């Protein structure tokens, strides 16, 4: 079972993400991520004990301050290996040192709890391989692209929904006031707890 730490979007961004999720679902039912709640994943790691992971991470960021994020562009992870080659539509968060440090601190608090595969599947990418071996996730560090996913379409790259998604420019900004924690079982997310940032 996996343990997740998420940032949830504010009202306007959440509304837009839900619009696109609905559009994808109505045109192409059962695509990856369509039915997931809108969120930015700080961590998604397989752990030995969910409750201990929750306790450790909440203690680690108990004194963290709230921070500002900007979402100024959309993108696509083409041929996303995490969705068996689907094209994942996302809203990219402008990377800043604060969110990178927050992710790293959370990941480091769980290194003793992580369950890793015996052999890494990320050997072709040095940074991802190193991250997986240390943290149990390939996306901890500078190679991580903070984002809010919409859906992953198993369709052609020139699909009209993908083209339409990329056309419109965006500009969202909001203060992150809370981190939420989740138990993740395949496509299901079960809320565990949250912590308010100062």
Predicted regions and their residues:
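Basic, often amphipathic N-terminal segments
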Residues: 1-71, 76-79, 96-175, 190-198
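Acidic/polar active-site rim loop that often engages polyanionic ligands
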Residues: 83-87
